[in-house]
């Protein structure tokens, strides 16, 4: 118990001294994750006005907030999460479990027949702390996100997803390379150094898989 307490204290100390946490508080952003996305978007110039953007695993809303900030009042931002999220101006949000067919169908109905320019996925399972459990759960969510992009992302569009390095990672990246002209692995500055997370970016969705 004492170890857990020390671990919690260390996390709290790191969290409140984190420059990205302070920046988020100062700028009214919902999470420090907004700055991971900001770096990724700017580096690869992924956003343009009038785009249709889907944000999977959106809560508490930092990514959707960042997208809306960059594209202004143009385009559409559609967000989904198993956790509820307070409303954000200009963001269409669905509260539900992406793994459930009924929720996915409802989200697709919100989207209509509109092709998507950019699919973002920051989804992650609740961590058990056991890698042999967490990694397969993470990869399952990643497969669902890839399927969604297959079905709704327009030819030439981009797909950005959070992944944990571990079993299944290399195979997943290979699958992305069959679908996109260019695939890059990114570790933004706002990602904590000890975190296994990286972001895989697929650009130039192909009309047909290789």
Swiss-Prot record:
Subcellular location: Cytoplasm
Reaction(s) the record says it catalyses: uridine(2552) in 23S rRNA + S-adenosyl-L-methionine = 2'-O-methyluridine(2552) in 23S rRNA + S-adenosyl-L-homocysteine + H(+)
Keyword RNA-binding: no
Biased composition regions of type Basic and acidic residues, renumbered to the chain: 187-196
Residues given in the record as S-adenosyl-L-methionine binding sites: 61, 63, 81, 97, 122
InterPro entries in the record: RNA_methyltr_RlmE, RNA_MeTrfase_FtsJ_dom, rRNA-MeTfrase_E, SAM-dependent_MTases_sf
Family designation: Belongs to the class I-like SAM-binding methyltransferase superfamily. RNA methyltransferase RlmE family.
One GO term describing the cellular component: cytoplasm
Name of the protein: Ribosomal RNA large subunit methyltransferase E
Keywords from the named record: Cytoplasm, Methyltransferase, rRNA processing, S-adenosyl-L-methionine, Transferase
EC number: 2.1.1.166
Superkingdom in the source lineage: Bacteria
Organism annotation: Stenotrophomonas maltophilia (strain K279a)
């Amino acid at each position: 118990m004492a170890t857990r307490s020390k671990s919690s204290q260390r996390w709290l100390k790191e969290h409140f001294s984190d420059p990205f946490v302070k920046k988020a508080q100062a700028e009214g952003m919902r999470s420090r994750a907004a700055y991971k996305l900001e770096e990724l978007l700017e580096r690869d110039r992924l956003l343009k006005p009038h785009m249709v953007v889907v944000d999977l695993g959106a809560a508490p809303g930092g990514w959707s907030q960042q997208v809306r900030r960059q594209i202004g009042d143009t385009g559409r931002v559609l967000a989904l999460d198993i956790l509820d999220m307070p409303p954000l101006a200009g963001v269409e949000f669905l509260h539900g479990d992406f793994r459930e067919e009924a929720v996915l169908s409802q989200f697709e109905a919100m989207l209509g027949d509109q092709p998507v320019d950019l699919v973002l996925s920051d989804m992650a399972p609740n961590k058990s702390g056991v890698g042999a459990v967490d990694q397969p759960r993470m990869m399952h969510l990643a497969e669902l996100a890839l399927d969604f992009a297959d079905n709704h992302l327009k030819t030439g569009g981009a797909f950005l997803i959070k992944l944990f390095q571990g079993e299944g990672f290399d195979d997943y990246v290979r699958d992305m390379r069959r679908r996109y002209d260019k695939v890059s692995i990114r570790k933004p500055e706002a990602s904590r150094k000890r975190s296994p997370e990286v972001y895989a970016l697929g650009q130039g969705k192909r009309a047909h898989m290789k």
